[in-house]
Design a protein with these regions (language model features):
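Extended, loop-rich substrate-binding clefts of extracytoplasmic carbohydrate-active enzymes
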Residues: 1-8, 12, 89-146
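Generic N-terminal segment detector
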Residues: 1-47, 277, 297-298
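Short, well-ordered beta-strand segments enriched in hydrophobic/aromatic residues
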Residues: 18-20, 27-29, 141-143, 150-158
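Acidic-aromatic substrate-binding/catalytic surfaces of carbohydrate-active enzymes
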Residues: 26-83
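Short Pro-Gly-centered flexible turn/kink motifs
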Residues: 77-85, 280-296
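Short, acidic/polar linear motifs in exposed loop/turn regions
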Residues: 160-161, 297
Length: 299
């Protein structure tokens, strides 16, 4: 059976949802929540599910983090001798959080449906200046879905007349039948130290070959030496890969059982100030990154 696509109405009447599916695999992407991947089943195995009763505006579930990942302390930064003040959307910590795409409405601009895969292209064009980020850009998200994998390619085009700073990331939450007995494996020798407001203070050495989740409450950021992260659960093994050479991994356990956020990023919190992972995009220049999820075995 070839992949199919349909638009459905969300349980909340204002949600615009695109569903891509065949007999064993499905994905639901919410157009007006930043074209975020809210549900994903690969080969009958649920990997990403609704986080109810947690709210999207609190979880940023599967949103693309752009033009900055995680936080900007007090919403203040300087770039090329100009000082900027962004909106504060994490009020209790007085930070700007997770960029500007999470609540934007994307459009479907192309789709290719085949027997073995579906490719859907979503686009958002920012034509107005944002407080603290007076630049324009075009974003395309290309979701490629197969029975045992999902690829997400992000293309950013600077449409403004000036160079802008950026980092980029992705914020998916994965479900496990038993998170206590699930494990994370990745190559890292350094992690970020945070203050009480989750702003980096520095780094410390990290020498564990894997993390057994158990009852750990995690909100950690790791410098990755390779672009591969393995998530092993009792029912599936997942590989998360990034095309970026300089990668970081934010790991977060939300206040919901058997769920964990694994966030691949190109920078760390407060990167607009500490410059760790910070990049620049010149006028008419493009940046592209690909993240891929692959089930390598399942029961």
């Amino acid at each position: 059976m070839s992949f199919q696509v349909k638009q459905i109405q969300g349980s909340k009447s204002d949600l615009k949802i695109i569903e891509i599916f065949n007999e064993t695999t499905s994905a639901k992407i919410v157009l007006n929540q930043g074209a975020s991947l809210q549900e994903l089943t690969l080969n009958t195995i649920p990997l990403i599910q609704k986080l109810d009763p947690l709210k999207y505006q609190d979880t940023f579930a599967s949103s693309i983090l752009f033009p900055f990942v995680n936080r900007i302390k007090d919403g203040i930064y300087s770039f090329e001798n100009n000082a900027y003040q962004t909106e504060i959307n994490e009020v209790h910590r007085n930070n700007a959080l997770h960029g500007y795409l999470y609540d934007k409405e994307f459009q479907v601009v192309n789709q290719i449906l085949e027997s073995h895969k579906a490719t859907i292209v979503f686009e958002y064009i920012e034509t107005k200046f944002t407080k603290g980020f007076p630049f324009t850009y075009k974003i395309q998200l290309v979701y490629e879905i197969q029975n045992d994998s999902l690829g997400l390619k992000v293309n950013v085009l600077n449409t403004s007349s000036k160079t802008f700073p950026f980092t980029i990331g992705w914020h998916p939450y994965f479900t496990s039948s038993d998170l206590y007995n699930s494990r994370l494996t990745f190559d890292s020798t350094k992690k970020v130290l945070f203050d009480d407001d989750l702003i980096p203070l520095g780094t410390e050495m990290f020498n564990e070959s894997e993390i057994v989740i158990q009852n750990k409450k995690l909100d950690h950021c790791f410098f990755l030496n390779t672009n591969l992260v393995d998530f092993n659960t009792p029912t599936y093994k997942l590989e998360l890969r990034s095309s970026s050479d300089n990668s970081f991994l934010q790991v977060y356990t939300p206040p919901k059982e058997n769920v964990i956020a694994l966030e691949p990023t190109t920078g760390i919190s407060n990167s607009f100030n500490n410059k760790i992972g910070l990049r620049k995009l010149s006028p008419n220049q493009e940046f592209e990154i690909v993240w891929k999820l692959q089930i390598t075995n399942h029961q």
